[in-house]
């Protein structure tokens, strides 16, 4: 298809000109376009109008018209301009017209919208002007033969998307590239949619408006109705044998313009005789929407006119008046719904006509002389098939009523079975009374029935789907329920005169033999009863409407001339077939008529009982018949009619019968149709029990399940993924070895992959080989490292896959990384200072563990100074949120009422003198080496000027180096001598059946927490408990740490941590030897001199009393009090004074300063006593065998200094004290003391009177500041704290010096206390 475009050669701007057409007087007004009135020319006045203006203002007369569309009443045509100009008048209609079919609707709708039709574009002689097609529409539909000129409109048709879609395949080919396609698409889009809105905002105004605006109004709805009216009409043919004349009624020509018809049926009237009035209810039947399929051609041999008047043979009809609303009236007679209406011979009122223009009539029916003729009634069903052939002999008007009865019942039965639509009424009175009744959809008739002429009826309606009608019948039934007051006055005036005419029976019908009985047909009655609804009335003959016997003026009753039948206004809507009611006919004389009517009513009641309960009740009207045949009838009119009498209830026999049928059908499932979808499988499913049994047997009963596939980076311990973890994967190969005749599998090659997460930087140290996990922990800083745990998991996955391929058995587990204090063997705990940065003061590390309410004691101990610090826990300590300033840490802890406690030395274990000598000599060598190491590596220590709160920072590094390498690493290197001594120590403990808490393992097992064993002395930062103002005592519970004390000197506490530093005094002895030999610099000499002075001044204060108190742990919580300290002192005379000084000391000692609490005389005395103290220390080391390793690990340098100064005087006092306290032997049974709880009487009695006097310079104000939280001091027995007495006791036990037992009774840890042999009050060793 080729598309041509015409480009204008004129260069000036286009200005459309208004075209003026000559007006034609006979032409109608111009058609209104686009919903807006178009102004006509000035020459058009009134009804005279010429051609309309162009529909689009931009179309000028100069534009050439492409094609012309001519619209005619019966079709349309499309032609060229030359052809159309010749057809200037209505007479020149082309012979060939296109009908208004569906294709025409698509064409005309596209032209109305201003679009170029897409389906018939090829057939239209197109000529494009500026890219559009100009169409000229000539409308001849509103013109008559006298009118010449049509209404002309010009319209511009644009291309639409439909045209583009159809033309693109013909235009494009395979040679087009993608760019060509996009170019064409963009141009087409720009031409079709010049304004493309891409704004995302919603445009509700565009959504509500119709995007297609009509450019021209072609009245397509009128054309559609025209097309429907042009469909074939119903042709009803009737063969009437009257006088040998055959009457054939064919389709009628009618005008195509009748306007909008509310009804679907058109009634055309012809002049006929008055016999048409006597057709009863044929005028009032309410079949408004009967499809054409239900009105087939039927041929009925009709009965004589006298009988036709009562049989009501007729077809559907509609009456329309030009001056009023149309009334849809349809009639259905017993003889047949679709039978053709005959023309009667009754000449009554032959000249009457309707108040309207009458159409031409085709003929008059002659009178019917022959009444006694045998007739054949052929009834046609909805499908055009004859349903029943009934032959009855009509004996004439004077025949028996039985024949009439049978005939009427037969016709009624046929109608009930065949009709699919309810009838409004089949009245037993003439249309004189009912013509004026109000219709439901139309007003009252504007003409009396007496003026009706002969009428001819044809069906004019749109086709409908029969399935829609049959499935659910829409009963638009006109109501009959209006009173006689609604009747036309002219009809009421004629009623008395036409009383006998309405009956349509001669007077001789009253003389019918009353003895004749009505013949019944039970089979037909049964079939008929199934179609009767509950609202169908029981009818009988009665008196005339305005007779004296009529009950009310508004009631409808029959005449009194004999056999009659009436009609019922059934206003019922139901899916089922609604049939006309039973018709009761009576004889005219005597009680036989009443009996016959009663029998008919009884049968009708039994037949109607089926719908009695399911349908709504309808009001009824009861009337009284004539004097001859007085019967009671019930005629339901509609809801607006008053209820005169009660409705008669029917028998329940049939209802019971149906209920039995339903029960039987439900019992045997007769009407139950099952679908295959509903039939699901009922096969029993078999489940294998063996897999379930195996699964249940392999289930673990543990509550904590560990996923075998957990990775190091995703495993959770303690509710957090940030816990440092260790992953150990064991690999092993099993080798089969025959041991005799029994094969056995033994591991042949074993190796493991250990991955340990570092706490310092988050890297993962890993090692592969046959190595223990503990060795990896200690040397993890020297191993290979991975950047993070994710890389470590990837390495482990790869390694596992390789080992599995080699046939190794794999077993792995992920565990929380053990703390540094738990890694080594017993008594081999590394330095606690490794957990803290070296050189930091203890006050800087002070943990405020008890300040938070609800904190567990275990957590406090974990963060405390008991050696439970994780490996390389520098960042943990620095990030701890519970660190407090060093100056007020004690006050905050004391405000809580409980202090954490001070690590105290335990009862020393007796070792052989040879072992003691060896250890002592080895320790001296190590101390000397450490001193030289410190001198060689001065950069490893921090100067004391940086730490003003740490007076012994120089000793810190020296004590650490005694058991560590200079790099400060945490891997201890044991010599063979150390391992031998440790082994002997353990054997001795096992032989004596003593549970040695030499490490945190035993201490934690007893529920006492870390820091309570021998080795945990070093793990506790304040292991010495001296030279500081931090005094924490009495742990927070059985499960917590009893020893979480802190002080300002972490270095001093580390002196006793090394397993080889079994005698803490050896450190000072080595220092003293170095002082004598001049190995130290003068600055170091001065520093150590000041340290020894401070130790001597406070040796009794911080030595024995504090170590005695710190042993109280677990449930036996002790508050810091004067009694708690004084009762442990040897000087019982100075209890209160010693307690005041023992509970507190100077907050801090500045380097290079003397004790601030000493006067000048005391300081001078201390300076004089320094050589004597050194000599005593040296003599004690040479004379006395070395003490037990546990005591030397736990004792602080202050206590050793006090022991060296006053050893001989205190021994004598100790013997006196042991013999003078009889209660001690009672209150101190053989106990197993905690590693940090046991102390000896010798240690308690190391304070001299001079030291006690040194404690006294303290103001009462300071005493009051330190003692407000102390427990009450009263007389009473103290609970013996042993393993046999673990019950809870008051948090602050009342202590008294009168009832204090041995020091070992203060603890409840299962550790035996061993005192000197000369201690009579000591425990059994």
Curated annotation (Swiss-Prot):
Phenotype upon gene inactivation: Late flowering, especially under long-day conditions. Reduced expression of FT and SOC1.
Subcellular location: Nucleus; Nucleus, Nuclear body; Cytoplasmic granule; Cytoplasm
Biased composition (Basic and acidic residues): 518-529
InterPro entries reported in the protein's UniProt record: PHL_dom (IPR046467), Spt20 (IPR021950), Spt20-like_SEP (IPR046468)
Alphabetical list of Pfam families matching this protein: PHL, Spt20_SEP
GO cellular component, one term: nucleus
Domain of life the protein comes from: Eukaryota
Entry annotated with the keyword Cytoplasm: yes
Induction record: Repressed post-transcriptionally by white light (at protein level).
UniProt-annotated stretches for the region Disordered: 313-371, 462-558, 593-616, 852-875, 1160-1325
UniProt biased composition (Low complexity): 596-607, 1160-1224, 1240-1262
GO biological process: circadian rhythm; flower development; long-day photoperiodism, flowering; regulation of timing of transition from vegetative to reproductive phase; response to light stimulus
A GO term for molecular function: transcription coregulator activity
Tissue: Mostly expressed in cotyledons and leaves, both in mesophyll and vasculature cells. Also present in roots, hypocotyls and shoot apices.
Polar residues biased stretches: 313-331, 504-515, 863-875, 1225-1239, 1263-1286, 1293-1325
Quaternary structure (record): Component of a red light-dependent nuclear complex made of PHL, PHYB and CO. Interacts directly with PHYB and CO; CO binding requires the presence of PHYB.
Function: Triggers photoperiod-monitored flowering by repressing PHYB-dependent flowering negative regulation, probably through physical interactions with PHYB and CO.
Protein name: Protein PHYTOCHROME-DEPENDENT LATE-FLOWERING
């Amino acid at each position: 298809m080729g598309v041509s475009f015409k480009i204008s050669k004129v260069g000036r701007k286009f200005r459309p000109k208004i075209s003026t057409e000559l007006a034609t007087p006979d032409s109608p007004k111009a058609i209104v376009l686009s919903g807006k009135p178009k102004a006509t020319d000035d020459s058009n006045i009134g009804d005279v109008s010429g051609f309309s203006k162009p529909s689009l203002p931009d179309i000028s007369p100069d534009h050439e018209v492409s094609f012309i569309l001519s619209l005619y009443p019966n079709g349309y045509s499309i032609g060229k301009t030359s052809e159309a100009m010749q057809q200037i008048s209505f007479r020149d209609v082309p012979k060939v017209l296109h009908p208004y079919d569906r294709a025409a609707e698509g064409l005309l709708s596209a032209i109305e919208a201003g679009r170029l039709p897409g389906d018939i574009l090829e057939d239209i002689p197109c000529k494009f002007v500026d890219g559009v097609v100009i169409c000229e529409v000539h409308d001849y539909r509103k013109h008559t033969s006298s009118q010449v000129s049509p209404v002309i409109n010009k319209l511009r048709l644009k291309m639409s998307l439909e045209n583009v879609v159809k033309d693109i395949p013909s235009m494009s080919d395979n040679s087009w590239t993608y760019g060509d396609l996009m170019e064409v698409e963009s141009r087409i889009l720009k031409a079709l949619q010049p304004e493309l809105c891409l704004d995302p905002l919603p445009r509700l105004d565009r959504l509500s408006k119709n995007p297609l605006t009509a450019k021209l109004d072609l009245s397509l709805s009128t054309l559609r109705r025209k097309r429907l009216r042009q469909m074939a009409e119903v042709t009803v043919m009737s063969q009437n044998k009257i006088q040998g004349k055959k009457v054939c009624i064919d389709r009628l020509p009618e005008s195509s313009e009748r306007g909008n018809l509310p009804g679907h049926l058109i009634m055309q009237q012809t002049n006929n005789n008055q016999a048409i009035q006597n057709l009863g209810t044929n005028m009032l039947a309410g079949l408004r929407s009967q499809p054409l399929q239900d009105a087939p051609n039927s041929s009925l041999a009709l009965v004589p006119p006298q009988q036709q008047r009562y049989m009501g043979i007729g077809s559907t009809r509609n009456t329309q008046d030009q001056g009023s609303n149309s009334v849809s009236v349809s009639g259905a007679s017993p003889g047949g719904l679709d039978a053709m209406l005959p023309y009667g011979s009754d000449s009554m009122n032959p000249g009457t006509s309707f108040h309207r223009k009458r159409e031409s009539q085709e003929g008059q029916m002659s009178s019917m002389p022959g009444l006694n003729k045998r007739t054949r009634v052929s009834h046609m069903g909805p499908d055009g098939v004859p349903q029943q052939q009934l032959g009855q002999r009509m004996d004439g008007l004077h025949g028996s009523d039985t024949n009439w009865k049978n005939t009427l019942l037969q016709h009624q039965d046929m109608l009930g079975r065949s009709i699919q639509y309810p009838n409004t009424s089949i009245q037993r009175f003439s249309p004189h009374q009912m013509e004026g009744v109000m219709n439901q959809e139309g007003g009252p008739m504007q003409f009396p029935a007496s003026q009706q002429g002969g009428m001819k009826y044809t069906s004019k309606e749109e086709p409908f789907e029969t399935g829609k009608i049959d499935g659910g019948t829409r009963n638009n039934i006109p109501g009959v329920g209006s009173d006689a007051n609604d009747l036309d006055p002219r009809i009421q005036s004629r009623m008395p005169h036409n009383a006998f005419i309405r009956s349509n029976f001669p007077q001789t019908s009253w003389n019918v033999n009353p003895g004749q009985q009505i013949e019944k047909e039970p089979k037909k009655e049964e079939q008929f009863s199934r179609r009767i609804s509950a609202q169908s009335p029981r009818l009988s003959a009665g008196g005339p409407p305005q007779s004296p016997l009529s009950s009310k003026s508004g009631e409808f009753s029959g005449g009194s001339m004999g056999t009659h039948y009436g009609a019922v206004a059934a206003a019922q809507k139901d899916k089922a077939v609604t049939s006309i009611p039973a018709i009761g006919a009576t004889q005219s004389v005597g009680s036989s008529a009443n009996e016959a009517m009663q029998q008919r009513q009884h049968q009708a009641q039994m037949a109607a009982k089926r719908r009695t309960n399911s349908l709504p009740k309808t009001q009824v009207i009861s009337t009284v018949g004539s004097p001859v045949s007085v019967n009671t009838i019930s005629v339901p009119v509609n809801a607006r009619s008053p209820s005169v009498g009660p409705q008669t209830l029917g028998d329940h026999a049939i209802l019971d019968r149906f209920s039995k049928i339903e029960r039987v059908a439900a019992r045997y499932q007769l009407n139950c149709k099952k679908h295959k979808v509903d039939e699901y499988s009922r096969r029993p499913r078999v489940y294998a029990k063996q897999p379930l049994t195996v699964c249940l047997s392999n289930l673990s009963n543990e509550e904590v399940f560990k996923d075998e596939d957990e990775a190091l980076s995703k495993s959770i311990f303690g509710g957090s993924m940030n816990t440092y973890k260790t992953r150990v994967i064991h690999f092993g190969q099993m080798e089969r070895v025959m041991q005799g005749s029994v094969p056995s599998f033994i591991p042949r090659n074993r190796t493991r992959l250990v991955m340990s997460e570092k706490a310092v930087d988050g890297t993962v140290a890993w090692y592969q080989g046959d190595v223990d996990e503990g060795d990896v922990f200690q040397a993890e800083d020297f191993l290979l490292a991975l950047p993070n745990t994710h890389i470590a998991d990837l390495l482990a996955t790869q390694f596992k896959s390789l080992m599995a391929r080699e046939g190794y058995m794999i077993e792995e587990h992920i565990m929380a990384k053990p703390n540094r204090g738990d890694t080594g063997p017993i008594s081999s705990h590394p330095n606690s200072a490794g957990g803290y940065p070296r050189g930091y003061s203890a006050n800087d590390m002070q943990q405020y563990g008890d300040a938070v309410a609800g904190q567990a004691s275990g957590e406090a101990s974990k963060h405390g100074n008991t050696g439970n610090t994780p490996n390389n826990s520098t960042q943990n300590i620095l990030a701890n949120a519970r660190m407090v300033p060093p100056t007020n840490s004690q006050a905050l802890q004391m405000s809580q009422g409980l202090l954490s406690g001070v690590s105290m030395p335990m009862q020393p274990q007796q070792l052989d003198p040879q072992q003691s000598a060896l250890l002592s000599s080895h320790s001296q060598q190590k101390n000397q080496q450490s001193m030289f190491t410190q001198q060689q590596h001065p950069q490893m220590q921090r100067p004391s000027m940086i730490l003003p709160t740490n007076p012994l920072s120089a000793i810190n590094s020296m004590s650490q180096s005694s058991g560590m390498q200079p790099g400060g690493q945490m891997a201890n290197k044991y010599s063979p001598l150390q391992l031998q001594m440790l082994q002997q120590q353990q054997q001795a403990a096992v032989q004596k059946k003593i549970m040695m808490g030499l490490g945190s393992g035993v201490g934690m097992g007893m529920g006492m927490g870390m820091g309570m064993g021998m080795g945990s002395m070093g793990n506790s930062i304040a292991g010495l408990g001296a030279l500081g103002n931090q005094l924490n005592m009495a742990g927070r519970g059985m499960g917590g740490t009893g020893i979480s004390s802190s002080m300002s000197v972490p270095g001093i506490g580390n002196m006793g941590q090394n397993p080889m530093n079994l005698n803490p005094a050896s450190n000072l002895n080595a220092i003293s030897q170095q002082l004598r030999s001049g190995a130290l610099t003068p600055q170091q000499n001065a520093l150590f001199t000041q340290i020894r002075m401070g130790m001597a001044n406070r040796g009794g204060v911080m030595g024995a009393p504090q170590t005695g108190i710190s042993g109280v742990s677990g449930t036996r919580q002790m508050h810091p009090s004067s009694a708690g300290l004084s009762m442990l002192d040897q000087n019982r005379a100075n209890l209160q004074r010693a307690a005041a000084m023992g509970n507190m000391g100077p907050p801090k000692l500045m380097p290079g300063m003397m004790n601030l609490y000493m006067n000048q005389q005391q300081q001078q005395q201390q300076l004089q006593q320094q050589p004597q103290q050194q000599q005593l220390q040296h003599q004690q080391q040479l004379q006395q065998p070395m003490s037990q390793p546990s005591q030397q690990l736990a004792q602080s340098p202050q206590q050793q200094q006090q022991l060296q100064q006053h050893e001989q005087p205190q021994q004598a006092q100790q013997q006196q004290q042991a013999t003078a306290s009889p209660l001690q032997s009672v209150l101190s049974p053989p106990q197993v003391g905690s590693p940090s709880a046991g102390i000896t009487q010798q240690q308690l009695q190391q304070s001299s009177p001079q030291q006690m006097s040194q404690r006294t310079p303290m103001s009462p104000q300071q005493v009051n500041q330190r003692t407000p939280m102390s427990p009450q001091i009263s007389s009473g027995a103290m609970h013996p704290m042993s393993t046999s007495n673990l019950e809870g006791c008051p948090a602050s036990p009342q202590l008294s010096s009168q009832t204090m037992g041995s020091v070992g009774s203060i603890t409840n840890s299962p550790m035996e206390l061993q005192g000197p042999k000369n201690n009579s009050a000591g425990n059994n060793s």
